[in-house]
Amino acid sequence: FLNFNKLKNNLEAIPEKSDVIIDFSLCGFVDHSVMENVDDYQELFYKKGGNIEVIGLDVLGADSKHPFALRRLLPIHKILPDNKTKRQNNLSLIAENFDLAYQSTKSVDCLFLENFIYFKTKKIEHIFNELTEKSGRFRSFDVTFSEGEFIAKEVVRTTMLFIKTAKSAPAFTLDKEGLLERLYALAGYEDIDIESHKDFSNRFYLRGENPKEIRSFFTNELVRFFESNAYYHIESNKDGILISNKERIASIKEVKALLDFGIRLNNAINETSNEAISH
């Protein structure tokens, strides 16, 4: 509550027709007055054509089913099992729309992430809010991990998508910002240019162990797919493909976009693989 004035001032400065995301995942608790005030702002923005989505409450527990109940970090056994947040209820609806299974509870079954270079310097704690295709080929999830030790330790929560591709893909990373370039360089990944696509090579950081294999994998169709779609950080290894965007929990709109992107990327990979076989 003490920090609500700062949040209020920020909300007052934003045009009411805007799309806004409020992330409470780093808060120790959120009291009922904050919940009520945020709800009022959500209604105001909605009437003006905007939207406010609240994320991060699913990492906090409540000992009441009231929608504005105080939420705080609670021991697992004290969290009401059916006391889902609005985001979790919306994830259940996404599961129905995409024909997926939804599991909101925490799981330490994270071995499928261990071989990705992205996590080499990170300690994975658990995944939660998992959306899984019945065949197990697609897994969207929120993940909590930490970097550093002691006072330098930083806890991060983000949303990712894992795809177990039908056709094996070479080990590579595709990144637009180059923020993780040093990490992948230390892993022995080389900078790779796609010679027939200079614009693509200028816009994206493509790295990998086997340039020849990667250039063969990045067909004209696959390059055009990446050029014409929203940007995501992508890492491929022998286990599958890991896709992420921002280092925070994704909004419902962003989860839908991530799933849609992943499904279409998998289709594009399968199509290019089939074309390569036919030739």
Task: Indicate residue ranges for each PLM-predicted region.
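Charged, low-complexity intrinsically disordered regions
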Residues: 84-279
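Cytosolic C-terminal regulatory domains/tails of membrane transporters and channels
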Residues: 1-87
